[in-house]
Structures are given as structure tokens and as C-alpha cells.
């Protein structure tokens, strides 16, 4: 009579391999979900910063200097730039994210417009929006 031990050992080996495969698939799914979560969080933060910049520009009638004085950042000619670190705090060092607002010509009297972009340090645009406001008559 033959022993059933090799058959049981083979069955256990197959079960361990199936378990290892399932564990590897689960780890890959969790890693993918973590990456997606980080991208979505960055996009959410970019939207918040862009909307804050847009609201500040509208409240200041498109005056980049006054908007920068209120929200932060620097104005360089016709561009307002805010440098942000990986925690979305303003930084003077190497930025992880950059918010840029620049005026855009509308071709219409009494209508001001600006383009606001938030980009990662690798150049990938996270969020972009245009903001318009009514300029005061002079």
C-alpha cells in the first residue's frame, strides 16, 4: 500500500502558492489605491489653492500685488507666483507645487480676466482655471 504523504504535501504546496498569489495581488491593489489617493489629494489641494487665489483676485479687482500681500507669494512683472512645499505650505525653498496667476486680455472693456495654474515640480498641471471680474469705471 502506498503512502498518501506526497499527495498531502503537494496539496499543501499548491495552497501556499495560491495564498502567495492572492497576497501579491492584494498588495498590488493596495499600492495602486495609495497612489491614486495621493494624486486625488494633491488635486483637491490644488483646487483649494486655485479657488482661494481666484477669490482673492476678484476681491482685489485683479490687482496682483494686493492679492499677493493678502494670500502670499510674489509678483514678478505680470505674474503672481506662490511656491508651495509638499505639505501645501508656502515656502522660499525648493517648491513641490507652484501656483501661478497671470492676467489675460479679454478684448472687452471693464472685464478683467486671469489664468490660474497649479503645477507639480515635474511640470504636470494639477489644476487650471480662469477667473473674471468686473473692473471699476475710471
Language-model segments: residues:
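N-terminal leader/signal peptides at the extreme start of proteins
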Residues: 1-7
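Short hydrophobic/aromatic segments of transmembrane alpha-helices and their interfaces
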Residues: 2, 12, 28-29
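Flexible, low-complexity segments enriched in proline/glycine/serine and punctuated by aromatic residues
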Residues: 7, 14-18, 30-138
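Alpha-helical transmembrane segments
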Residues: 20, 24-27
